[in-house]
Design a protein with these regions (language model features):
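Hydrophobic alpha-helical membrane segments
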Residues: 1-260
């Protein structure tokens, strides 16, 4: 399947649900606004506490939104604010999955940090050499350190991004397999995404035009665009795990294209 197939399936599943999807997004924005507003009331000396609270709360909220859209996709009854309950009822699971993904990503993250240190060190030493007499080899060495750091940053960033794609289905897998542990969900996501990471990347990239339209509409369009993206991602997830319903949709789409 290609990106257009997943988007077509998303539009098919969204028939009669566009309004509900927009309401879920509006409710999510309202809840996050209230949380951020309350965090903003904290004294400046406790700003760090507000940031920690935001992080702790945002993970289950994000989990809940994905869960709400999955239920909507499956034609289950879901209210606009149900994401809040769905998220916090699975507070431990959402954070356990996030932590397991963090452990998987820790090595590339360390490499990225090292690359930033090398860049900063190289630039700092080179800047100092402009005011202090250093030999040409030493100056060239500082430039070399910065260049190595930059190359390492590019390579490690690409590595981290491609590696992260392995785990993008972990939330969805855990939602449909309630008895599965967080570690198992992350592992199953990696298995499902093997050989399919590029497909998900191109699917996400195909929404760039919609993102521009959302920005032009002062963000209002995102109330409908984000549900569209979630539904397309769920369609991809169904395909990645071998769900027969998605295969059937692909067959229908292929037949219609052949007929044309």
């Amino acid at each position: 399947m290609i990106s257009s197939d997943f988007r077509a399936e998303a539009r098919r599943k969204l028939v009669g649900k566009w309004g509900k999807g927009a309401c879920i997004m509006l409710a999510f924005l309202l809840v996050t606004f209230v949380i951020n507003f309350i965090s903003g009331l904290l004294p400046d000396s406790y700003e760090w506490l507000g940031q920690i609270i935001d992080i702790v709360i945002n993970v289950p909220l994000s989990f809940g939104v994905v869960y709400a859209f999955l239920k909507l996709y499956k034609d289950e009854t879901v209210g606009a604010f149900d994401f809040f309950k769905l998220g916090f009822n699975n507070f431990g699971k959402s954070w356990s999955i996030t932590f397991n993904i963090f452990l998987k990503m820790i090595v590339p993250a360390i490499v990225i940090i090292i690359s930033y240190i090398l860049i900063a060190l190289g630039i700092s030493l080179y800047s100092t050499s402009l005011f202090v007499t250093y030999s040409t080899p030493a100056i060239n060495g500082y430039v070399f350190i910065a260049i190595i750091g930059f190359i390492l940053l590019v390579v490690s960033s690409i590595w981290a991004t491609t590696k992260y794609y392995f785990y993008q289905l972990a939330f969805l897998i855990s939602m449909e397999n309630e008895d599965m542990s967080a570690e198992e969900a992350v592992t199953e996501s990696q298995k499902a995404m093997t050989g399919k990471r590029a497909s998900l990347f191109w699917l996400q990239l195909s929404f760039i035009g919609w993102a521009i339209l959302g920005a032009i509409s002062f963000g209002i369009g995102f109330l409908w665009i984000i549900p569209y993206v979630h539904f397309a991602t769920i369609a991809f997830y169904k395909y990645a795990i071998g769900d027969s319903s998605t295969v059937e949709v692909q067959s229908v789409n292929d037949d219609s294209k052949t007929a044309e």
